[in-house]
Curated annotation (Swiss-Prot):
GO term, biological process aspect, one: chemosensory behavior
CDD domains linked: PH (cd00821), RasGAP_GAP1_like (cd05128)
Full protein name: Ras GTPase-activating protein gap-1
Source organism of this protein record: Caenorhabditis elegans
Recorded name of the encoding gene: gap-1
Site (Arginine finger): R208
PH domain residues: 411-507
Presence of keyword Cytoplasm: yes
Amino acid sequence: MVLSCRVVDCGGLKLKENQTLLLLVSTIHNSSEVGKLSIDAEEKRSKEWLEMPCAEGMLSLKLTLWQDLLKGINSVFHGQVRVDVDENWKSGPAKWFYLRSKANEDGEGGEDGGDIGDATVKVTYQIDHILRMQVYKPLLDLLFLAGDVQPLTASLVAVIEALPKVELGPVSRSLVELMAQSDRIRPVLSSLYVNSILKCQDENTLFRGQSLSGKMLFEILTTYGKMYLITTLKPVVDKIYKERKNCEVDPARVAVGASLEKNRNNLLVYFQMLFERVTTSSTNCPHLIKQLLYDLRNVVGTHSSRSGVQRLAVSSFVIMRFFAAAILNPKAFEIRKDQPDLRVSRTLLLLSKLLQRLSNCSVSEGPLSSKEIWLNGVFETVTSEQHKSVMASFLDNISLVGDRSEPQKCTVFKFGNLQQVDRSRLAWKKVLHYKKRYVQLTNTHLIWQKDVQCAPKGTVPLSDIKFVNVDNKNIITIVCETMQLQFEAPGGVEATDWLNAIERQRNRAAHEIAETPGEHFFVDAERHVDKIHTLLYKYRETMIEWRDQLQSNVELDEKTAPELLKASYVVEEERQSHKDSLIATLCSTIDVTDAIQLAHTEYEKENKVSRRIDAIITAKKRQKSFSVK
């Protein structure tokens, strides 16, 4: 079973600073498993849902609201509340809960605890039956072989993309989690690139729309390129936040007494800093991202003879959706924790426009028009031949086409703040045993430092780690050949995430050293396959209808038939092959989906019988105890 909850509103909190609040969620009977939910202090809600596994029956939750969780001087406890929920919870879907002090946790204590505040929590109780991987293996094989289906337009991922009204975001996230660390991500993504190119009507808008390939590549950029993005942009963004210089160049917006020329110079100085940070960063980009961009260029080059289209495809992801989007909204990409004020926000908007303009000019063959005439002078400066040449070289280098002699940097898979525990030190206060550390997990090492800007205080090769464990106090113990490390995580869920991430990279590194590539499934891979199965089973009737239409050989209605069946974007010589392969894909998918659903049904039946037997045994025990009395 899975508990899902999020905060939809909160109020009455006495905040010292405009910081992110943290709601810790645990069960009364298992306080070691703690979930963490971030609450935006400005919007007074959590943007994400917290999902936690839980047992059946009545569930007693303990919700604790904190600010600054790492036990520092600024840590603030705002209160806690107990919530009881079960499968038939009638108090929802949202309800106000009033926070209590620790003394009033069980309803005891005085009434003079002060006004702590309150929060609204929306709780959804959901039961998911996740089966063993061997049940999902046939579906996983179909997904992994999607890049080998000929023609590529008839693969399972092409079918998923064509299903009506499908949210591609969650699907792409599950596919990336399943494939990103295997050797199947590249052929599968390449097949989706082909689909997007064939469906595109105008090469100038290539990969600008919503597609499964675009969603998957963006998911990889934001997941595996997160640290690369932050280290590249943060120095510039922090400087803009700190200095707050006026960069307004629109005459209609310039304040009275302000110098338009000075503002223009300020904007150009910031842009030059941003430009240099971006165009010299290709050596820091994770190699996986470079490989996928290299595949993107190859596929585009195969299907288009126009020069510059390959760079256009790369820039649409790396510049438009990644760097320019992050500059525009640094908080959403976790470059900053605070929202920019109006002046800083305007500066970031103008810089994002300039970066996009330069990128478009470096990949375009002709002149570009502009609706904002007042920006033309700045556009001419930032789109000089030198700027365009450097940008083009960056797009080549980051897609492995330019200088391949670049040194390969490591890929950061996880990073965050933990407390390093050193019990060997003699300290008169327990708190002195704890030191705040910024910890990074790469594909080869575990690195820790005082903060993100400081030099590393220590590093351990993953190959030297012999054992990793997490205790009930959220202490992560890492045993190496020459030392033992301990880090304390803010909660049980985060500690488990670190444990799984370290073990995953250790296993991956061991396979690479032994040269035994295989299926490196991470913990909870079954849940992601089950999400895809649930989607396919939801559209089972749609897939059966498509299969029957194709097998009947009846002429399709041009107005109502789905594009996947009409295949107007497929060349005439391959349409029959597309049809035959699509029928085979649909038949296999329906059979596999039915088999998984049958396993779910049998599991539910066995579970019901087991619960009935337990109920009968419990009832008989009660009768015996009553008769003795």
